[in-house]
A protein has these predicted regions:
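Class I SAM-dependent methyltransferase Rossmann-like catalytic core
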Residues: 2-37
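Conserved class I S-adenosyl-L-methionine
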Residues: 39-48
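Glycine-rich SAM-binding Motif I of class I
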Residues: 50-54
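Conserved SAM/SAH-binding beta-strand->alpha-helix loop
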Residues: 72-74
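A short acidic, Gly/Pro-enriched loop at the edge of an enzyme's catalytic core
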Residues: 102-111
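A short glycine-rich, Lys/Arg-flanked "PGG" loop and its adjoining helix->strand segment in the class I
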Residues: 127-143
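Conserved beta-strand signature within the Rossmann-like core of class I S-adenosyl-L-methionine
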Residues: 143-151
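Class I S-adenosyl-L-methionine
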Residues: 153-191
C-alpha cells in the first residue's frame, strides 16, 4: 500500500509537477496579477483539474477568450464540465503540446502557466526543450502582455529572463500551498 502511494506521488511530481491541486492562495496570487477590466485573450497552460481555470472563467468578461492547453486528456472531464457550466464564455480546450499551439505570434494578452519547467531541464541538450517551450510562450504573447508562471523551487528564473531579454518584473512567494510556490511575472517588451 505505501509503495503504491509513493509511486503515485512520484508520478504526480514527475509528470504533472504537483502533489495536489493548487491552493486558493496560489490561485489568487497568480490571477490577481491580471487586469480583467478589459477584454483579454488568455492562454492557460497545464490546467490539470481546473484550479486556475475556474477562477479565470469567473473573472473574465464575456468579451474575453480563454484557450486551455492541457496535453493530458485524463483531465478533460473536469475542464469540459467547467466549459459546459459557462456557455456564455468563450472557452476552448486544446489537447496538445504548447509548442504546437503557440505558432501564431502575439496572440495572447496573458499566458498563465502551470508547467513544471524544472522537469524540462536536460543538461545533455543544453535544455533545448525547456528553451523551446519558453520561446514559444514569448512568441505567442502580445507586446505588453503578461506571462505568469509558478514553480515550487526558485528555478528557471534566469532561463525565462534570458528568453525574454530582461529581468523578471516580479517574483513573489506563496507559502500557503503544498508545496510552497514562487510566482513569476514577466511582461513582454518590444523586440
Amino acid at each position: 500500500m505505501l509503495i503504491r502511494i509513493y509511486r503515485n506521488l512520484k508520478r504526480n511530481i514527475t509528470e504533472d509537477g504537483l502533489i495536489i491541486s493548487s491552493s486558493p492562495f496560489l490561485v489568487k496570487s497568480m490571477v490577481s496579477k491580471i487586469d480583467f477590466s478589459k477584454p483579454l485573450r488568455i492562454l492557460e497552460i497545464g490546467s490539470g483539474r481546473g484550479a486556475f481555470t475556474r477562477e479565470l472563467i469567473q473573472r473574465m468578461s464575456a468579451d474575453s477568450q480563454l484557450d486551455i492547453c492541457e496535453i493530458k486528456t485524463e483531465y478533460n472531464p473536469w475542464i469540459e464540465q467547467l466549459i459546459a457550466a459557462n456557455p456564455d464564455k468563450q472557452i476552448s480546450l486544446h489537447n496538445c503540446c504548447v509548442t504546437q499551439l503557440l505558432t501564431e505570434a502575439e496572440r495572447y494578452d496573458v499566458i498563465l502557466s502551470s508547467l513544471p519547467l524544472k522537469n524540462f531541464e536536460d543538461p545533455g541538450s543544453q535544455h533545448e526543450f525547456l528553451y523551446r517551450v519558453i520561446r514559444a510562450m514569448r512568441h505567442g504573447l502580445k507586446e505588453g502582455g503578461t506571462y505568469l508562471q509558478y514553480q515550487y523551487f526558485k528555478s528557471n528564473q534566469s532561463d525565462i529572463e534570458t528568453v525574454f531579454g530582461k529581468k523578471m518584473d516580479d517574483v513573489s512567494f506563496v507559502p500557503l500551498n503544498i508545496l510552497p510556490a514562487f510566482v513569476y511575472s514577466m511582461s513582454k517588451q518590444a523586440s
